[in-house]
Amino acid sequence: MRLDARDAFHGCAGRLTGKPGRFRFVRCDDCALVYQNPRIAADRIADWYDDEYIAHRRKSDFGLLTPLYRWAMDRHDRRKAALVGCYVALDASSRVLDLGCGAGTFLARIQATTGAHATGVDFKDLSDLPWMNAIDFRCGRPREQRFDRPFDLITLWHFLEHDYEPQATLTQARDWLATDGRMVIEVPRLDSVSFRLFGNRWPGLQAPQHTVLYSRDTLLAMVERAGLEVIEWLPWGAFPAYFYLFAGVAFKLLRGRGLDLGRAVGPYFAGEALAAPLLVYEKQLNLAMQTVVVGRRGAR
């Protein structure tokens, strides 16, 4: 695998985490995949996922804005559930696996609304959260897991860009998928409008947590190499593209200083209201996200 140094660009750690650091991304000259090089050793990366990290965030008290914050977080899970509902009908006999489940709220919603057996995998143990009681939570990495029955639905919501072994993970996940099952993968889109707008201050350059950055072509190539068949590719996702627009503007204004998410809650929702006319066309504008729905090759 050859690296093209002319395509190297950088992401700064402190924009979301407050931790110092500058990390380089390079583009493979053979396959065009963009990835972090060098990267934090796998046994040290957990230090960058503290309780303030978005997917693991425990704080939910933001004063008068708390109801709005909780509604928005629940809306994200509702959008995930609506998206997967277009491709698979879940009931009490179904089995669902979420890789990189974080705080597990999506699985809790799926279990509560469909009765499906919900399993979550994450390397950070958040099993003490009350809603985790209804979830079969596995603390660890995907390659460390063993399952004796296949899953009807496997989801990777913004997990693959964090994974140190994405190709191996997809191949393993294919083996866990039922013959007629579906896998839903959502990641930031490198060839998006927001990347062109913000460049090195694009929120998708969330280093060192994001180790791989995917364009449409490199994402589809990776899933196909894993023996998966593309059912549909979407230029949007359940994660709100507006977050990348808001954070990208904030990163430019802050010029490298960390974004305090607690203080940003009010401006975030005010900006979302102003951007509402644009966001009506989120699914057509290629703003920030992409989703690919796949099945086992030859099973359709």
Regions found by a protein language model. Name each.
Residues 30-31, 40, 217, 297-300:
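Short loop segments at secondary-structure junctions
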Residues 65-80:
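Conserved SAM-binding loop and adjacent beta-strand
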Residues 79-198, 211-225, 290-298:
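Conserved SAM-binding loop
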Residues 1-63:
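N-terminal juxtadomain amphipathic helix
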Residues 17-24, 73, 77, 211-212, ...:
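Aromatic-acidic/polar surface patches that form glycan- and anion
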Residues 164-172, 182-298:
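S-adenosyl-L-methionine-dependent methyltransferase catalytic module, highlighting the catalytic core
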